[in-house]
């Protein structure tokens, strides 16, 4: 048991990093997922198609591949764009945070979109009848109700995110 006891400080540090990475990625993914969901539900076809393409692409690629692409390919792309003689170093921690946020945003987008669409259209029409704008009706009426419906699925996706942090 001495091996386990000697490893406890390292395990504790790893646990703290895992929780930190999960929290940052969940908050960032939820923020960008909400924006993507609003874009997917937009009446602007270009915006809606871009968001749908992003979500479909990210959900069809394994996370480990996204991490590898970001870590190895993005520095080469940045070198080509900036014209530098060496590719800039992105860093492992920055790669992990950015890729997890990008990846989870696609999943949170679908959860958010389903939650928003679960609210009856009468709620939206009532908000418009009260004189609220689209943004006000979403912020004050639709999203609070939708979040209540989405909490179980959002927590499940966050648990999956916690498990996915083992890749980094």
Please annotate each region the language model reported.
Residues 1-168:
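Transmembrane alpha-helices and adjacent helix-loop boundaries
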